[in-house]
Amino acid sequence: KNSYSNYMLLPQKMEDALFAGDPPYDGLDAIFISHYHGDHFTPEDVLRFMNARPDVDMYVPSQAAIALRAIASAADQDIFDRVKSVDLEYKDAPISLVVENLEIEALRIPHSGWPTGRLDVANIVWRVTLDEATTVIHLGDADANDIHFSTDPEFWNSKQPDMAFPPYWFYSSQVGLNILSRRIGAQQSVGIHVPAAMSNDPSLRPAELRDVDLFTVPGETRAISGH
């Protein structure tokens, strides 16, 4: 719940519905956390959510799991049966696991600011396939530098995602655009982590962001073509 004076916070009505399991959140099976930063992961709220929603699993970097355990009481310990953590260093090989109808792949890509800033933050890229049919990739706050993506072409070439969710700054440089088209190769993409000041009107955005799809309103969705 830290906006860092730049990002939108979750509206209270939406938070209440999420915690209560009201539509459209009643069919939620799993949540994925990219990294432990205040605008992505608040341990106190996540602990409360996991207790409120015993039907939901959570996949997190180990840094987030450690923070969650640090505030959990004895009465909270049952939730950790549903908390699946990954411990990856930069340049580690991707890991994968299959849980029921989900194939889950995780890869650590540095947080934006590399190579001088936020090097201690484990930013996890999640590539998730549902029912062996629909693949979505979420990049968290990944750094838009091809050096992070060029070292493992086998991983990137093994699947074409149906939808990618890159941070909006990938659209602001040719390098970022090349990563999206040549490395990730998703059929669709929508930019995330958009500053609150970004206009809903594309014509009022910076020139490089006028022709791309961005999430700018809390709760908005996109259909995945063909699914």
List the predicted regions and their residue ranges.
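Active-site neighborhood of phospho(di)ester-bond hydrolases with catalytic His/Asp-centered motifs
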Residues: K1, G27-D39, Y59-S62, I137-A142, ...
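Pre-active-site segment of Zn-dependent metallo-hydrolases
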Residues: K1-F32, Y36, E44-R48, D143-K159
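Active-site HxH/HxHxD metal-binding segment of metal-dependent hydrolases
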Residues: F19-E89
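Extracytoplasmic
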Residues: Y25-G27, D92, V121-N123
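Active-site-proximal loop/helix segments of hydrolase catalytic cores
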Residues: E44, P110-R183
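Binuclear metal-ion centers of metallo-dependent hydrolases, dominated by the metallo-beta-lactamase
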Residues: A72-L102, L177-H227
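Beta-strand-turn-beta hairpins that frame and shape the catalytic cleft
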Residues: I95-E105, T129-V136
